[in-house]
Curated annotation (Swiss-Prot):
Official protein name in the record: Chaperonin GroEL
Pfam families membership: Cpn60_TCP1
Originating organism: Xanthomonas campestris pv. phaseoli
Gene Ontology biological process: protein refolding
Gene from which this protein is expressed: groEL
Example of a GO MF term: isomerase activity
Length: 546
C-alpha cells in the first residue's frame, strides 16, 4: 500500500479553503446578467466558451492534493444542485464558498465546529420555510418565459421558445434539445403518441407526397403476439369493413399470409389497413401496448388475460381521430380513451418513476408519461459556429430545467433578492449557545453573497446596493442588467424556488462537513528514482565505430 500524506487541524482546513476559493472564484465570474465567460481547453478540437457554472466546475483539477479535495467537494455542491434542480450551480458555489470561508475563520478562532454546523443548519431550515412562503406558483406562459430567459443568461428567444413548447405539449410533455441545422432556434412538436416503428410494407402508403399512410378515424387493433394466419384476423376485418373505417394493426409481428392478405385488401380498397410492429421489447413492449390501449379506449388482445385474436370483436378495438404512419414512425393523434383512465395510468407511471433507481428506466418512463399526457416537443438550436452551438445548447438545457423546476415549486424574485428577504426570518433565531448563534450569523452573511456577486460582476459597489435592497421590501431589488431598482417580478427577473432552495441546502450540507473536518489523508507524492548510469562497453570492442 502506498504511503500517505496526512494533514491535521488548521493546516488541513487552510489548504482545503484555498482549493474551494480557486474553484469558486472561477465559477462565480459567470454569475448574473453581466457575468463573464470562461474558456475551457479541450484535449482535442477548439476550446469551449461557457457561462455555465457546472461546466466550469467539472473542468477544474488542482495539482495540490489537499487543495483539490476542497475543490472537489464544492464541485459536488454544483453537481448535486444541477441534478436536483437543473440550474443554480453558480449560486450554490457562491453560497458554499461564503459558508466555508466564514466557518473556517470561526473554527480558527477557537469556536466549536459542531455547534457552528448546528447553527448553520438551523438557519438554513428557517430560510427554506421563508422561501416557500415567498414563493408564487407559475400559472402563465409569461412567467415560464421569464424564468427561461433569466436562466439562459437573459436570452429572450430561448425563454419564449421553451414557453411555447410547454404550452403545446403541456407541463408533463417531453421537451428535448437537439442541434439544429440553421441559424435560428426552431420548435418541432409531435402531438399525440409517437413511437419508432413504421409500416411493414410500402404498399400501405396512401399519401404519395409525404410517403406515409394516413388513416382518418381508424379502429386500432393491439396484439402482443405474432400474426401470421389470416383466419385469426377475419372476425375483426369483417367488423371493420362493415363499419367502413380504416384499421391500424399494432402487433409483435405481422408476416406471411396475413401480411399478404392485408396488402391485397388495401390495394383493392376492400379495407384500408396499415400494419406496424409494436414498439419496445419484453415487459416494456407490454407496458407500451397497455398505454396505447388506455389512450385509444381499446383492449390489448392477449392470451395472458384470456383474449384470443380469433375471438376479438370490434368492441375490443381502440379509436383515434387520426393516425400517421411513415417509414420510421407511427403517430396516434387524439385517442378516444377515457380522460380519467389516462390520468390514472399517468399517476401509476409516475409512482414507478419515483421508485426506480435506474436513470435509463426513469427516462423511458418519463417518455411514456409525455406520450400519454400530451406529446413531444423538440427544440432545434441554431447557431453560426460549432463552438456557439455547444454553448447555446447548454444554455437551452439549463433554461429548460429551470422552467420545469419553476412549474414544480413556483418562483421567487430573482437576482439574489429572495435570499435577502429570507434574512428577516433567519435573523430572529437564537442558538442554544454562543457558537450556534455565530453559526446562524455565518449563514446570514452567506445568504447575501449571491446578490453581492451579481452586483460586483456588474461593476457596482456590492455593499451600497445590498443596503438599498434591504431597505425595500417584497419583490424590490436591483436589476444588474440595466442598473435599475424596482419590482423584480415586473422586471421579469424570477428564480425557481426549487433552484434557490436546492442551492442553499446543498451548499450548507457540504460546508458543514468541511467545517467539521479535522484531518485529511492523501497519497504521498512519489519520489523519482535516480536514473541508471549508462553501462560501460564490453571488453574487446575497442576500435569499433558506432
Amino acid at each position: 500500500m502506498a504511503a500517505k500524506d496526512i494533514r491535521f487541524g488548521e493546516d488541513a482546513r487552510t489548504r482545503m479553503v484555498r482549493g474551494v476559493n480557486v474553484l469558486a472564484n472561477a465559477v462565480k465570474a459567470t454569475l448574473g446578467p453581466k457575468g463573464r465567460n470562461v474558456v475551457l481547453e479541450k484535449s482535442f478540437g477548439a476550446p469551449t466558451i461557457t457561462k455555465d457554472g457546472v461546466s466550469v466546475a467539472k473542468e477544474i483539477e488542482l495539482a495540490d492534493k489537499f487543495e483539490n479535495m476542497g475543490a472537489q467537494m464544492v464541485k459536488e455542491v454544483a453537481s448535486k444542485t444541477n441534478d436536483n434542480a437543473g440550474d443554480g450551480t453558480t449560486t450554490a458555489t457562491v453560497l458554499a464558498q461564503a459558508l466555508i470561508r466564514e466557518g473556517a475563520k470561526a473554527v480558527a478562532a477557537g469556536m466549536n465546529p459542531m455547534d457552528l454546523k448546528r447553527g448553520i443548519d438551523q438557519a438554513v431550515k428557517a430560510a427554506v420555510v421563508e422561501l416557500k412562503n415567498i414563493s408564487k406558483p407559475t400559472t402563465d406562459d409569461k412567467a415560464i418565459a421569464q424564468v427561461g430567459t433569466i436562466s439562459a443568461n437573459s436570452d429572450e428567444s430561448i425563454g419564449n421558445i421553451i414557453a411555447e413548447a410547454m404550452q403545446k405539449v403541456g407541463k408533463e410533455g417531453v421537451i428535448t434539445v437537439e442541434e439544429g441545422s440553421g441559424l435560428e432556434n426552431e420548435l418541432d412538436v409531435v402531438e399525440g403518441m409517437q413511437f419508432d416503428r413504421g409500416y411493414l410494407s410500402p404498399y400501405f402508403i396512401n399519401n404519395q407526397q409525404s410517403q406515409s399512410a394516413d388513416l382518418d378515424d381508424p379502429f386500432i387493433l393491439l396484439h402482443d403476439k405474432k400474426i401470421s394466419n389470416v383466419r385469426d384476423l377475419l372476425p375483426v376485418l369483417e367488423g371493420v369493413a362493415k363499419a367502413g373505417k380504416p384499421l391500424l394493426i399494432v402487433a409483435e409481428e405481422v408476416e406471411g399470409e396475413a401480411l399478404a392478405t392485408l396488402v391485397v385488401n388495401t390495394i383493392r380498397g376492400i379495407v384500408k389497413v396499415v400494419a406496424v410492429k409494436a414498439p419496445g421489447f419484453g415487459d416494456r413492449r407490454k407496458a407500451m401496448l397497455e398505454d396505447m390501449a388506455v389512450l385509444t379506449g381499446g383492449t390489448v388482445i392477449s392470451e395472458e388475460v384470456g383474449l384470443a385474436l380469433e375471438k376479438a370483436t370490434i368492441k375490443d378495438l381502440g379509436r383515434a381521430k387520426k393516425v400517421q404512419v411513415s417509414k420510421e414512425n407511427t403517430t396516434i393523434i387524439d385517442g378516444a380513451g377515457d380522460t380519467a383512465a389516462i390520468e390514472s395510468r399517468v399517476g401509476q407511471i409516475k409512482t414507478q418513476i419515483e421508485d426506480t433507481s435506474s436513470d435509463y428506466d426513469r427516462e423511458k418512463l418519463q417518455e411514456r408519461v409525455a406520450k400519454l399526457a400530451g406529446g413531444v416537443a423538440v427544440i432545434k438550436v441554431g447557431a453560426s459556429t460549432e463552438i456557439e452551438m455547444k454553448e447555446k445548447k447548454a444554455r437551452v438545457e439549463d433554461a429548460l430545467h429551470a422552467t420545469r423546476a419553476a412549474v414544480e415549486e413556483g418562483v421567487v424574485p430573482g437576482g439574489g433578492v429572495a435570499l435577502v428577504r429570507a434574512l428577516v426570518a433567519v435573523g430572529e433565531l437564537k442558538g442554544a449557545n454562543e457558537d450556534q448563534t455565530h453559526g446562524i450569523q455565518i449563514a446570514l452573511r452567506a445568504m447575501e453573497a449571491p446578490l453581492r456577486e451579481i452586483v460586483a460582476n456588474a461593476g457596482e459597489e456590492p455593499s451600497v446596493i445590498l443596503n438599498k435592497v434591504k431597505e425595500g421590501s417584497g419583490n424590490y431589488g436591483y436589476n444588474a442588467a440595466n442598473g435599475e431598482f424596482g419590482d423584480m417580478v415586473q422586471f421579469g427577473i424570477l428564480d425557481p424556488t426549487k433552484v434557490t432552495r436546492s442551492a442553499l441546502q446543498n451548499a450548507a450540507s457540504i460546508a458543514g462537513l468541511m467545517i467539521t473536518t479535522e484531518a485529511m489523508v492523501a497519497d504521498a507524492p512519489k519520489k523519482d528514482e535516480p536514473v541508471m548510469p549508462a553501462g560501460g562497453g564490453m571488453g574487446g570492442m575497442g576500435g569499433m565505430d558506432f
